[in-house]
A protein has these predicted regions:
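Active-site mouth loops of central-metabolism enzymes
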Residues: 11-22, 105-113, 166
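Extended substrate/RNA-proximal surfaces in nucleic-acid metabolism proteins
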Residues: 51-160
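Histidine/acidic-residue-rich catalytic or RNA/ligand-binding cores of hydrolases
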Residues: 144-150, 170-180
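Short acidic/histidine-rich active-site segments
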Residues: 43, 186-190
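An N-terminally biased module of ancient metal coordination in phosphate/nucleic-acid-related enzymes
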Residues: 1-72
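Active-site metal-binding loops of divalent metal-dependent hydrolases
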Residues: 9, 45-46, 80-81, 137, ...
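Non-catalytic positions within long, well-ordered alpha-helices that form the structural scaffold/packing
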Residues: 33, 126, 183-184
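Short, acidic/polar
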Residues: 22-29, 87-92, 116-118, 178-179
Length: 190
């Protein structure tokens, strides 16, 4: 498959803070395809209450909508999980979803997480043979100093950054500079 694969989208309508309805989801699909995306993985937020009952039906319809746009436009299903002590067990039991039935897990943390806690969570997931994809890596201030980013990568995780974090004037904005440096140095994988 050539083209962009977007592994972090809130495109299923009515599930969480993303798309409100199918019209909005279609517009999101069309815009993504026009920008070169050829595969989108829908990643609604994980809830300890379990999977939304309609999640698989919505994912199937999303696939149909993408196919109407172009035959080479594919979709998948996963979740943006929030790390908690029971996450690994929930993944094993199918109560939380990996990215399109792979070993990759899109996981986010509290922005104020300590590096020690973040590292321990990554180790717990990798020891269970999952590959954590840390969502919104730009939000974790504990990674701004030292070698934490490199250490996490060496541990086996992948890093995802929001495109919007690269926008703006990098000359004056320290956050934008940090984000751009991570991309330039090859530390951002998705």
């Amino acid at each position: 498959m050539t083209g962009i694969i977007d592994i972090h989208t809130h495109i299923l309508p009515g599930i969480d803070d993303g798309s409100r309805d199918w019209d909005e989801s279609r517009r999101m699909l069309e815009a993504a395809y026009q920008q070169g995306t050829r595969c989108i993985i829908a990643t609604p937020h994980y809830s300890r209450r379990g999977l939304p009952p309609q999640i698989y039906e919505l994912a199937e319809r999303l696939s149909e909508e993408a196919g109407r746009i172009a035959p080479d436009f594919k979709t998948g299903l996963g979740q943006e999980t929030y790390f908690h002590e029971g996450l690994v067990e929930n993944l094993k039991q199918g109560k939380a979803l990996t990215l399109e039935n792979t070993r990759y897990v899109l996981v986010e943390f509290d922005p104020q997480v300590s590096y020690h806690s973040l590292y321990q969570a990554v180790r717990k997931m990798t020891m269970a043979r999952y590959i954590p994809v840390i969502a919104h890596v730009e939000r974790y201030f504990c990674l701004r100093e030292g070698d934490g980013v490199e250490e996490l990568i060496q541990c086996g995780c992948r890093l995802q950054m929001n495109y919007s974090s690269l926008e703006g004037n990098g000359i004056w904005n320290r956050d934008v500079r940090w984000c751009r440096r991570q991309v330039a140095e090859g530390r951002i994988h998705m």
